[in-house]
Design a protein with these regions (language model features):
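N-terminal maturation segment of proteins
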Residues: 1-531
Length: 531
């Protein structure tokens, strides 16, 4: 099956980057940032000349999705987005640290790619300094963001004992691979230290700058509109989207009150919502006694949905999802990468049982694991979109959030977890737009968010600065989920009707697509989108 197309062949040939999406690595990320100007020139030639002859090109007419991507990327805002998007939350150092801090990744092919191209790590400080020190972007940042750079540029290495414990390689190979690990680690640490010096130097400029409003607001509304479309693959009325977010939040609060009273008789209908959240969070039945109990709980839920979706409903399974338990204070709580669902237990005492079903449905089956492996095994029809751009986030993360509502035989506590996660994604819409489009401050948004979430205050602050540094991305979950709801009509969902699941399977095979084309394909009336 053809896993590529003309445009991807041109780009990978000229930029000398990996063409197999399974082998994309941080090295390709570095090459992409470094060669951005060359990339734009390639797209420009491809855009204006249907007969563009290239050594790797088989001359075919461009399709509508390719045209949309190329025209969108050639807008001047895309270059600004590359520079501002390479920040403390999203940068090559973080990508490398994920590999070097995780013993499970050292035997993966991407580690070999990193070792082979290890000298390219020396280019990261120059590339990153250029991105964050542009004088026109000074007000995009504040001292807090620069300090957060320093907090993530760190290097807690793993030991040979930790690696040996999980490796499937022979003893001799383990010794050889770990020698390579030490070589890469030394280069990585040296460059982290060099970049930290640059950050500290630049941070001094913010000492006397009391910049409370950060983000796109300083650059302009047109730029934020571009960022939002870059993650959704569709242009929406931002003020309508914000209004809908507030309406959805009220609906979810009302629903949470109903289910909270079902699980705790001491909760009353007129109780302050923050007190309800405290009672739910501190309910002893939802706490774990040990990491072992937590691990078994997750494994059982993964097994449950594997039996339902793979064995009973005949969803495709190309690989079984692996649950990888690890502990690292600098990495996120849970995420999926190719075949692995990584679960960070660093803060396990604050993790709750009622969130497990939603997280498993989102990250594994029928969520990201099912969607990604279906995509890889059936051939990505528009691989260049998946490879270089965020424009598929609406589809991919929307499918993940939509999957959270596809549970079976759930308890009231499971429903509470689903409501909490949907409320969380709804708040993202409100906060992201308020920060970047209406000039609200992170402090204002913190005071707003904390009244609706079970997470601790430091995690909420981390979330807000994530939105500052990656405008539009956080909106993609809820908007994408709404598209799938409109297609499948979740309000009339019948869990025993196999036709519903046949449509789910078809949607996975159709994608991933920018939401604009998914909406057109299924004839969704955009005027009724926010109802």
């Amino acid at each position: 099956m053809n896993n590529t197309n003309d445009l991807l062949k041109i780009i990978t040939h000229d930029l000398k980057i990996e063409s197999d999406v399974k082998l994309i690595s941080t090295i390709d990320e570095i090459k992409y940032i470094k060669q951005w100007d060359k990339y734009i020139k390639l797209l420009g030639k491809y855009s204006i000349n249907d007969a563009y002859i290239h050594p790797s090109r088989v001359n075919k007419p461009k399709n509508d999705i390719e045209k949309y991507l190329v025209e969108f990327t050639l807008k001047p805002e895309s270059t600004i987005q590359l520079e501002l998007g390479t920040n403390y939350y999203n940068n090559p150092f973080s990508s490398i640290y994920f590999i070097l801090s995780n013993p499970f990744t050292i035997d993966n092919p991407v580690f070999n790619v990193l070792y082979k191209n290890r000298n390219m790590i020396n280019q990261i400080p120059i590339l990153l300094t250029k991105c964050f020190s542009h004088p026109e972007y000074f007000n995009y940042y504040n001292e807090e963001i620069l300090n957060r750079w320093l907090s993530v540029i760190q290097y807690k290495p793993i030991s040979f004992k930790e690696y040996k414990k999980v490796s499937q390689k022979s003893d001799d190979k383990q010794i050889l691979i770990f020698k390579k690990y030490k070589i890469i680690l030394k280069i990585f640490i040296d460059n982290c230290n060099e970049f930290s010096k640059e950050i500290k130097k630049y941070a001094k400029k913010y000492k006397n700058n009391d910049n409370k409003i950060v983000g796109c607001y300083h650059i302009g509304k047109t730029y934020y509109e571009h960022c939002l479309e870059s993650h959704l693959g569709i242009k929406l009325d931002i003020n309508k989207l914000l209004k809908w977010g507030h309406i959805e939040l009220k609906r979810l609060v009302k629903k949470m009150r109903v289910y909270a009273q079902k699980v705790d008789s001491t909760i009353k209908s007129d109780m302050d919502f923050t007190k309800i959240l405290d009672k739910l969070k501190n309910n002893p039945t939802q706490k774990y006694k040990s990491i072992k109990e937590l691990e078994e709980y997750y494994k059982n839920v993964i097994k449950k949905y594997s039996n339902i979706y793979i064995k009973k409903l005949k969803f495709p399974e190309y690989e079984k999802p692996n649950l990888v338990i690890f502990s690292n204070s600098k990495l996120g709580g849970g995420y999926y990468t190719l075949n692995n669902f990584y679960l960070n237990t660093f803060n396990w005492k604050n993790m709750r049982k009622f969130t497990v079903e939603s997280l498993v449905l989102h990250e594994t089956i029928p969520g990201h694991h099912t969607q990604v492996h279906t995509m890889l095994n059936h051939g990505i029809r528009y691989p260049v979109l998946f490879y270089f751009h965020s424009i598929l986030n609406g589809f991919i993360e929307g499918w993940g959030l939509f999957s959270e509502q596809l549970g079976f035989n759930q308890t009231d506590w499971d429903i509470i977890g689903q409501i909490e996660y949907e409320m969380y994604r709804t708040l993202r819409i409100i906060v992201d737009i308020s920060l970047h489009y209406h000039g609200k401050t992170p402090d204002e948004m913190f005071n707003f968010m904390k009244d609706y979430l079970l997470m601790d205050h430091e995690s909420i602050k981390n979330e807000i600065y994530r939105y500052v540094c990656n405008p539009g991305q956080a909106v993609s979950y809820k908007v994408g989920s709404q598209v799938f709801k409109k297609i499948i009509n979740i309000n009339n969902w019948d869990t025993i009707n196999n036709k519903n699941y046949e449509l789910c399977n078809k949607l996975i095979l159709d994608g991933p697509l920018p939401l604009k084309f998914l909406i057109e394909k299924y004839k969704i009336n955009i005027n009724n989108f926010f109802t």
